Amino acid sequence: MLYLASRSPRRHELLQRLDVPFQTLELDVPEVRAPGESPEHYVHRVALDKARAGLALVQADDAQAIVLGSDTEVVLGERVFGKPVDVDDAIAMLTVLAGRTHQVLTAVVLVGAQRPPLQALVVSEVTFDALDATRIAAYAASGEPMGKAGAYAIQGRAERFITHLSGSYSGVMGLPLFQTSQLLTAFGAH
C-alpha cells in the first residue's frame, strides 16, 4: 500500500490524479532549518523525515508499505520562506517577493522497508508582479496565505500576481506529478 505522509489537502488532491490507491497519514514532523543548512538540503531532509516517520507508523501492520514524503519551500537567495505564522508575517513575505523572481523547491521522497529511498528535487522559478501594499494586505486578509509556503497559493487568488512560471506548476502546488509518477514507477508502486 502507498501512504502519503502529509496533511496537505493539495498533495492529497494531486496524488489522486496519478490514479494510484493510497492512504493519507496525519503526522506532525518538525520543519526547522538547521543553521547553515542549504535550502536544497533542508527541503530534502524534511521530505525524508516525513516519509520515514510515516513508515515507522505503518510498517508493523504493512510490511510492504511505501511512504511518500514531500516538502515545498519558497526560496529567495538563501532565505527560506516557510508558512506564515500570522497575517503580518504573510504581508512581510509577500512584500519581499513582490516584483521579484523566486524559486520554489519541492522534494519528493519514497521509502519502503529494506529499500533505499528514492528522491527527486524539483526547482521552479516564479516571478511576481510588483504589488502595492493595498493588494498585499487584501490578499493576506483573505486567509489564503495561511498554511502555504511563501504565503501564497499558485492555484488560488495569488495566480493573478504571477507574471511568469518556469518549471512545474504541480510542484509549486506541492507535489510535482511528473517526477512523482517516475519515482512511483521506479519503486514498483505505479
Curated annotation (Swiss-Prot):
One of its GO terms (biological process) is nucleotide metabolic process. It catalyses: dTTP + H2O = dTMP + diphosphate + H(+); UTP + H2O = UMP + diphosphate + H(+). It is found in: Cytoplasm. The record marks 10, 72, 155 as: Important for substrate specificity. Disulfide bonds: none annotated. Belongs to the Maf family. YhdE subfamily. This is dTTP/UTP pyrophosphatase. It comes from Xanthomonas campestris pv. campestris (strain ATCC 33913 / DSM 3586 / NCPPB 528 / LMG 568 / P 25).
